[in-house]
Amino acid sequence: QMYSPDLLAYLIYGVKLITRFGGKVAILTATMPPFAKKELELALGDDIAIRDFSHLKPDRHNVEVWDKKLESVDIWNKWKSLKDKKSRKTLVVCNSIETAQKIYKELKALSQADGIDVKINLLHSRYTRADRRIKESCILDVGKTSYKSHEIWISTSIVEASLDIDFDYLFTELLELFSLFQRMGRVNRKGLKSIDEANCFIALQLRDAPERHYRSTNSDMRFVDDDIYDLSIEAMKNVSGVFSEQHKTELINTYMSVEKLEASDYVKKYKKQYQNLEGFYIEEKDQEPIRDIHNIDIIPFSVYKENVEEIEKCETIIKDRSSEVADKLKAIEYIRDYMISVPWYLVKTDVTKTEKDIVLKKKFKVPIVHCNYDSEMGLQEIYKQERGNNIL
């Protein structure tokens, strides 16, 4: 998806520094925002060459746009209507983990109600590293172009760039154009499949709960800039049928132009951060994370309980000053397999129910948290402390 304004400022400033010291940089991307292109040109001057290869790609997508929220029943009915297809591997991409989990449960219920035996799978970022590794291995196998299947996979933005997969059909919420086109790249990836019928179904309206809505007043919980989301709706609302790579580029250049974004909060935040970097203000803020996303690593108590003997052995190795460095690193990596990275606002030290902390190294503690976790759904709920008869 589109980089946060802070991260974009770091990247462009970093590229500028690399070239200043004689380095060469190649940026390969399927979606280059005009604003980012302009900022690169300003940072690098004449020492830049830009080429667009979108016209070389075959048409891969046929689009059907829905001006409503992404609903499980619509996905299910469409999937059933494709029963005569040799393969109908279906990828559902949601904007939040909560939405993905809901749609997964709903699709499982619909399949059971209709008595249809189909593999329905869930993948998002709130699994332990060990569980996620297994799921990613499975989706990579299913996602091979030559693999024929009727499976349904529900996921989030983690499939946009990190996984090389090729599905037959896509159902997705709109986030913004850049993210959307990355998601579409997971369908008919090599352009070898027919596009006589729609293979990408896009819901323009967000399904997420109010606190995750794009206009939320809490910027830490928002997942898209207001202006960029509104412009993306405007760009996609009249799209229908075969959707060429050139058309995608035209929409980005038209609706995400420098002029349209100039007054947006996104650009204002970018410019402020870039100015801070130019003035080396970063030295005074070296304790702040690069991205405006604060994550905390945790271990679910149920996972800890199942693997307590091995984890305690690893803790002993880590604490023992006589242990070899290689053994300590191996022990840390073993424990990392049971960790989940979650947003900071989900774990509050004075409220969250924790069992203990595991110290991996100085100033790096991993809390063991009481929560609802299993390898099917991933992390669902983090439990709060009980005090007397009250739940805080």
Please identify what each model-predicted range represents.
Residues 1-2, 33, 99, 161, ...:
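Residues immediately C-terminal
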Residues 21-26, 89, 149-152:
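Loop/turn-to-beta-strand initiation segments
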Residues 1-54:
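Post-DEXD/H (motif II) to motif III coupling segment of the RecA-like Helicase ATP-binding lobe
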Residues 33-85:
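Interdomain hinge/linker at the junction between the two RecA-like core domains of SF2 helicases
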Residues 28-32, 96, 154-158, 172:
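Ser/Thr-glycine-rich phosphate-binding loops at phosphate-binding pockets of nucleotides
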Residues 145-160:
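Conserved two-lobed SF2 helicase motor
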Residues 37, 74-93, 100-144, 167, ...:
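C-terminal helicase lobe and adjacent C-terminal extensions/tails of nucleic-acid helicase motors
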Residues 2-5, 63-70, 148:
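Short, flexible loop segments at the rims of nucleotide/cofactor-binding pockets, characterized by
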